[in-house]
Amino acid sequence: MATLPVPHGVEAGKTGSTDPLRDAAGRALDEKALIVEATARGLTEERRDAVRRKSLADDPWWYHPYAHLAATTGIGIGVLAASIVGMTRLPDPVRATDLLVIPGVALFANYFEWRVHRDILHKRSWPFEIMYDKHTAMHHMVYVEEDMPLRRVEEFRLVLIPAAGVLGIVLATAPLALALAYFWSATAGWLFLLTASLFMVSYELLHLAYHAPTDSAVGRMRIIAKLRTHHARHHDPRIMQRYNFNVTVPLFDWLMGTMAPKRNTP
């Protein structure tokens, strides 16, 4: 049997190159090899389990899945709590115009989620190569549409954002909140942080829920089952580079024309 092409990110037990000087041909191969392999029916359960075992073996000795979950959600919940406390201490009442921040931030966050997923997690680009390697060449190799659930809690590391990444998002958005507080109102600044942190926690918990066993209490929830179907379609390697990039609510998939077509559509 001919040897199938494989993503650089998983070949020979490696988790991926992060060399920013890789040529265009190498990048293109990374982005297409998994699709080619899956189409050729080479993405077997044994093949995926080998990547799963390798990724778990690479976990540092200090890694604990529940500590990871507590850290990522804890940062978001901490910012959320600080925002609520900050708002309660403001002397002025909340104005109706301040509330416009909530839908505005939610809309931008949904777009940001869609754009990062499409253009960073599925396209190798400097300086985000490691994010591509962890997502396309690992997460998508382990979890496919017909086999989404985690096998063990140690696999949280394959699904959750690193705690440092969540902290980085908070630090990156803080200047925007300060700008709103200065140019609009202090309430608007706090509402920005509140909405952004709530969205971030929702992203983490929803993504983890999609990869929970379907017969679990979480997996059986109707809303989770509905949203999981959208995300699971994205885990078909043949279409993962083109469709269903939203993880929370597929608003920008709908707006940008990246909703996966129905299966009976040619």
Q: What name fits each language-model region?
A:
Residues 19, 23, 30, 42, ...:
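Acidic-enriched, low-complexity/disordered segments with a strong bias for Aspartate over Glutamate
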Residues 30-37, 96, 186-189, 208-210:
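Short low-complexity stretches enriched in small and charged residues
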Residues 5-7, 17-20, 42, 60, ...:
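Proline-rich intrinsically disordered, low-complexity coils
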Residues 111-266:
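Membrane-embedded catalytic scaffold of the fatty acid hydroxylase/desaturase
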Residues 1-66, 264-265:
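Transit-peptide-like, low-complexity N-terminal presequences
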Residues 2, 9-26, 81-126:
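Membrane-anchoring/interfacial helices and their immediately flanking loops
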Residues 12-17, 23, 27, 34, ...:
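A generic signature of intrinsically disordered, low-complexity regions enriched in glycine/proline
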Residues 58-113, 165-194:
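Long, highly hydrophobic alpha-helical transmembrane signal-anchor segments
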